[in-house]
């Protein structure tokens, strides 16, 4: 069960457990039992698809119960719990509690209860102990009035307990070393650290004179969030007022230690609450006046990213994150004790904070400083020659930690001890003279007042830096307006030294030895990187002055540098591409086509390490390198047909380009939000295009693995939940298989570059292997000149049977598994330790030569290609009992050993290829059979009917040594031969095998073996009803040809294909509409060309 906030865990007075009596114990047990029963009822209701949300209040405790959705709802709506608690408490809400203490109510029963924050989330006891140790050190330092953290001398304080008084510890806990607490006690201390205060009774150097004094522990009532600051008036402190140190404020300590992820509405709520009920010394009942010495403010505790806390007394929420100092020790501890913690940590925010601390610390080391300095990411991106980053893992570009995912963050932390910054020289002076915001400098237009500019810049910064660390200090936050930093920054600050504000500008006179230039950063972070650090800040100006309203220097900003370079590279690419396709004017390069076909379309002469991408994706360094190598760049087009859609987009002509350049020169400073927004949109379009291409690639490869010619939607979730069922080969190193929407542009391009190598292999079937076919919409018209209307066809008109479609891939895989089983058993029967290909034809000719035992009773042994899916499943279930015994040798043993097709490796290599070829041959035969029937669509070939009547259909164009039969019986060599001769294959229908109406109304016209058993009866009944109705109609009405659903049809079959006009119905004039029920329109069909025997073959076509 989740208890509300943190006020529900501690009794209101500092009374020990000896004051509890049996009445309260029995009452608590009864409440726990009833709440557990209530939770069990919620669990039962959830199984009936009923959602329940329940809040129970008992004294100081709040129980949250219900189904999963109900508990999530209540835990996201904390105000509902608070309101209900206030309502139940009534006017006694703000009154001090003087009665018996209320025991903490925790519902241990009921497995669906939401656990309280922490033991499950922070299972590392060592980490908890270090966090509590940090809390005690900070409180002790504040009690001593020190600005830096002083380790707490546990031995001396425990030996002389009169030196220190501790207030606010949870009920029943005494002050001792953190290592002596159990995990629950450690979590209780961390959750209520904002109430704990240390007080020095005498200076530490006085000696242990008062050894009889005990460490004072005074329980403090923890009130709910809504009135926690207002409800402390009645709390009498047991400590002398003059003894309390003013610096030991719980709010500053909490802001100093912890990082929390608080939603925006919570932050705004706290901002509204705090001013209405400020926490003053008089409210606490402490008579000491407001101190004059400096009290650390929220600005003093700005972290390395310039964030400010949400409020001066913001509470700790349930999810307690590790303190920044613990994260600092994780980053800098040389031992391996933190490596398991890094590998198991999945919280992306904690990992990003660790990497942020790592980068800031290493950058400070490179500057020769002893405290963290924010890394100027955008400066490094715009001027990469100034700073070199050494030790970052391969294929991970240096950029903001907030842009990394969990795998890359872990890889960086694993190499944390080898990562270093090398300062080569000072940054470009033009970067130093830019403005403090992350966007390009914005010039004030004459009609734009400073207030509008401030609002626009603030909005611009919010759009670009939401969710990341702010790059400006507290003075910039004040200029941007109140509440901006708190609403955007979701993390509590880390403490830095106050003097760090004065070292923003860094000048390095003696650069270290140079090394190779670092890889230029990706475009994803260039327009949104930080340019606020390392800039000159006018220290002599007051906070009310707006630094961006003063005049700008004449030098160009980084945006002014990179934009012309991008335009020049864009023009260079367009010109070279136009030269390659043979046009005189520049033509826009179809970058996506070059990415999709890297072997047929590529570029030569690009600098080393630079591939063809849009110029917006390059930084300044790479753009300059491309321009330097402009004479050697050449576009190579091996297959011009791939560019048919891309050559129709000429770029602007010379006059338009000149006018555009003049327009840009006239307004060089109007870049701001709109331009960066357009740049961001272009990057989004590129990424979306790449994702669609990768999605299509995966769908195509998955369809090929299933033996289907059309792309099939990849079931990512089902593949993930069935590991090993689908094997994906050929992906670039370091890129796992997952949804394309989770990849960045760089990984998407890498995937597309190896598209030909990617291969899907389905090893075993699972539910949802193939998605269900969708119903198709067909537009039909019954008469010429009539308005066509859409109608929804029956699913089996154009698609295979639904069950077969769903299990098509499963049948193919099951068949191959049974083959492998038989090969394995045959090899064992021969005394070999490997599978041997079973000679099914020899066994069929000599059935007594091999005896197969262990098969299900109703299944004979034969080629697995002839089994249906049910028999295949039965055989696989009984695979442990299947055994072969060779009675008579069918083939020489040397031939078995030397057969190149026998080894398992050869079969496994050709398994996927054989499945694909087999399906392609099936599609070829279906297509040719449909053409022979005069239809413009494939029709399923009735192989069994043709086998029973081999003279009914003549197949021409097959290779000489290959007879026509079901493609399942062909080996891979014959399948390849048939596909090579596909242009010559042709079918001629000599004798009609089945009613033409069945062919037209059902795309699947298999033999009975291919029809599911549960549908055979329905099909046969339908045929009999149709036959009886037609016969009775023809006998009773002489004009039955015009009034029934069946019409005679004559089909030509003289060595040539049927023409559609000879078999498709033509409208007949009729005297009047038919009134017979169930009849449709009246059609007459004539095909008068005789067959080779001079006979006409009637067909039957039902009409609708």
Swiss-Prot record:
Return the annotated region ranges for Disordered. 509-559, 783-802, 1001-1044, 1058-1104
Locate residues linked as Glycyl lysine isopeptide (Lys-Gly) (interchain with G-Cter in SUMO2): 27, 184, 212, 225, 238, 271, 337, 436, 439, 443, 567, 579, 588, 622, 638, 669, 709, 717, 757, 759, 772, 841, 901
Q: What is this protein called?
A: General transcription factor II-I repeat domain-containing protein 1
Describe, from its UniProt entry, the tissues in which this protein is expressed.
Answer: Widely expressed.
The record, for SUPFAM superfamilies, names: GTF2I-like repeat
- Matching InterPro entries, A to Z? GTF2I, GTF2I-like_rpt_sf, TF_II-I
The UniProt keyword set, sorted, is: Developmental protein, DNA-binding, Isopeptide bond, Nucleus, Phosphoprotein, Repeat, Transcription, Transcription regulation, Ubl conjugation
Pfam families per record: GTF2I
Q: Which organism is it from?
A: Mus musculus (Mouse)
- What Gene Ontology terms for biological process does this UniProt record contain? transcription by RNA polymerase II; transition between slow and fast fiber
Q: Which residues carry this modification: Phosphoserine?
A: 448
Where does it reside?
Nucleus
Instruction: Tell me what gene encodes this.
Output: Gtf2ird1
């Amino acid at each position: 069960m989740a208890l509300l906030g943190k006020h529900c865990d501690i009794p209101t007075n500092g009374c020990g457990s000896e004051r509890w009596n049996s009445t309260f114990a029995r009452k608590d047990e009864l409440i726990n039992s009833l709440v557990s029963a209530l939770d069990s009822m919620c669990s039962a209701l959830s199984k009936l698809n009923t959602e329940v949300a329940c809040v129970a209040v008992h004294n100081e405790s709040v129980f949250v119960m219900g189904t999963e959705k109900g508990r999530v709802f209540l835990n996201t709506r904390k105000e509902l719990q608070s309101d209900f608690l206030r309502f139940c408490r009534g006017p006694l809400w703000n009154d001090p509690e003087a009665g018996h203490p209320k025991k903490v109510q925790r519902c241990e029963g009921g497995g669906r209860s939401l656990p309280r924050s922490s033991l499950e989330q922070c299972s590392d006891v060592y980490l908890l102990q270090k966090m509590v140790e940090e809390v005690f050190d900070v409180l002790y330092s504040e009690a001593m009035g020190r600005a830096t953290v002083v380790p707490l001398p546990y031995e001396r304080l425990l030996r002389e307990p009169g030196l220190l008084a501790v207030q606010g510890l949870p009920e029943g806990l005494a002050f001792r070393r953190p290592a002596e607490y159990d995990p629950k006690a450690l979590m209780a201390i961390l959750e209520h650290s904002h109430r704990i205060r240390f007080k020095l009774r005498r200076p530490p150097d006085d000696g242990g004179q008062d050894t009889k004094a005990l460490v004072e522990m005074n329980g403090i009532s923890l009130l709910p969030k809504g009135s926690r600051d207002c409800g402390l008036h009645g709390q009498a402190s047991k400590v002398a007022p003059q003894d309390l140190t003013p610096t030991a404020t719980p709010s500053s300590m909490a802001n100093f230690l912890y990082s929390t992820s608080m939603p925006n509405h919570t932050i705004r709520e706290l901002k509204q609450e705090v001013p209405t009920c400020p926490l003053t010394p008089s409210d606490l009942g402490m008579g000491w006046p407001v101190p004059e010495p400096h009290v650390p403010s929220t600005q003093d505790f700005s972290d390395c990213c310039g964030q400010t806390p949400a409020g001066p007394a913001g509470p700790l929420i349930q999810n307690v994150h590790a303190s920044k100092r613990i994260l600092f020790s994780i980053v800098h501890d040389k031992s391996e004790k933190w490596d398991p913690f890094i590998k198991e940590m999945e919280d992306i925010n904690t990992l990003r904070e660790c990497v942020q601390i790592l980068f800031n610390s290493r950058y400070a080391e490179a500057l020769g400083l002893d405290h963290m300095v924010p890394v100027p990411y955008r400066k490094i991106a715009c001027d990469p020659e100034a700073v070199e980053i050494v030790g970052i893992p391969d294929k991970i570009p240096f950029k903001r930690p907030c842009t990394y995912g969990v795998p890359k963050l872990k890889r960086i932390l694993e190499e944390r001890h080898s990562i270093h910054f090398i300062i080569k020289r000072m940054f470009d002076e033009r970067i130093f003279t830019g403005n403090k915001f992350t966007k390009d400098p914005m010039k004030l237009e004459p009609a734009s007042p400073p207030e509008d500019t401030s609002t626009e810049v603030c909005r611009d910064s919010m759009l670009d830096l939401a969710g990341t660390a702010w790059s400006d200090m507290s003075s910039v936050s004040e200029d941007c307006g109140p509440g901006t930093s708190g609403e955007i920054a979701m993390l509590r600050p880390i403490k830095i030294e106050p003097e760090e504000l004065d070292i923003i500008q860094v000048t390095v006179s003696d650069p270290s030895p140079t090394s190779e230039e670092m890889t230029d950063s990706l475009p994803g972070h260039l327009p949104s990187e930080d340019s606020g650090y390392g800039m000159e800040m006018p220290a002599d100006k007051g906070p009310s002055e707006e630094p961006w309203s003063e005049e700008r220097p004449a030098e160009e900003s980084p945006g002014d540098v990179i934009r012309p370079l991008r335009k020049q590279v864009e023009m260079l690419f367009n010109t070279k591409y136009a030269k390659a396709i043979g046009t005189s004017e520049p033509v826009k390069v179809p970058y996506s086509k070059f990415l999709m076909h890297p072997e047929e379309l590529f570029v030569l002469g690009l600098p080393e390490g630079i591939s063809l991408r849009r110029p917006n994706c390059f930084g300044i360094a790479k753009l300059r390198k491309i321009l330097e190598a402009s004479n050697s760049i050449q576009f190579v087009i091996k297959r011009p047909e791939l560019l048919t859609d891309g050559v129709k987009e000429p770029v602007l002509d010379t006059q338009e380009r000149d006018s555009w350049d003049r327009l840009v020169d006239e307004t060089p400073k109007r870049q701001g939000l709109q331009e960066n927004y357009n740049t961001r949109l272009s990057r989004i379009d590129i990424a979306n295009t790449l994702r669609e291409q990768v999605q299509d690639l995966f769908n195509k490869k998955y369809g090929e693995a299933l033996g289907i010619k059309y792309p099939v939607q990849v079931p990512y979730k089902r593949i993930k939940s069935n590991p090993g069922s689908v094997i994906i080969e050929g992906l670039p190193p370091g890129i796992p298989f997952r949804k394309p929407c989770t990849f960045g542009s760089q990984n998407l391009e890498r995937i597309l570059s190896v598209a030909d190598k990617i291969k899907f292999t389905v090893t075993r079937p699972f539910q949802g292997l193939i998605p269900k076919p969708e119903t198709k919409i067909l537009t039909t018209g019954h008469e010429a000149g009539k308005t066509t209307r859409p109608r929804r066809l029956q699913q089996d008109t154009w698609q295979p049977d639904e069950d077969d479609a769903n299990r098509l891939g499963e049948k193919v895989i099951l068949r191959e598994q049974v083959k492998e089983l038989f090969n394995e058993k045959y090899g064992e029967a021969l005394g070999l330790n490997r599978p041997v290909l079973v000679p099914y034809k020899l066994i069929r000719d000599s059935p007594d030569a091999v005896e197969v035992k262990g098969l299900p009773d109703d299944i004979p042994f034969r080629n697995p290609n002839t089994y249906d899916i049910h028999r295949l499943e039965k055989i696989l279930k009984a695979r442990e009992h299947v055994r072969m015994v060779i009675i008579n040798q069918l083939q020489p043993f040397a031939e078995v050993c030397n057969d190149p097709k026998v080894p398992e490796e050869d079969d496994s290599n050709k398994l996927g290829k054989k499945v694909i070829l087999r399906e392609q041959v099936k599609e070829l035969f279906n297509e040719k059979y449909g053409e022979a029937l005069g239809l413009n669509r494939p029709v399923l070939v009735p192989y069994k009917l043709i086998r029973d009547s081999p003279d009914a259909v003549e197949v021409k164009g097959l290779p000489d040594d290959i007879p026509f039969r079901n493609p399942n019986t062909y080996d891979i060599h014959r399948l390849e031969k048939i596909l090579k001769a596909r242009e010559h294959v042709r079918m001629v229908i000599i004798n009609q095998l089945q009613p033409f109406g069945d062919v037209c109304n059902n795309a699947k016209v298999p033999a009975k073996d291919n029809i599911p058993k549960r549908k055979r009866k329905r099909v046969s009944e339908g045929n009999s009803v149709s036959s009886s109705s037609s016969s009775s109609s023809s006998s009773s009405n002489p004009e039955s040809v015009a009034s029934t659903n069946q019409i005679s049809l004559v089909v030509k079959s003289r060595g040539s294909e049927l023409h559609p006009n000879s078999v498709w119905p033509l409208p007949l004039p009729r005297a009047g509409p038919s009134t017979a029920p169930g009849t449709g329109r009246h059609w007459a069909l004539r095909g008068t060309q005789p067959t080779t025997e001079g006979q006409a073959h009637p067909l039957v076509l039902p009409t609708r």
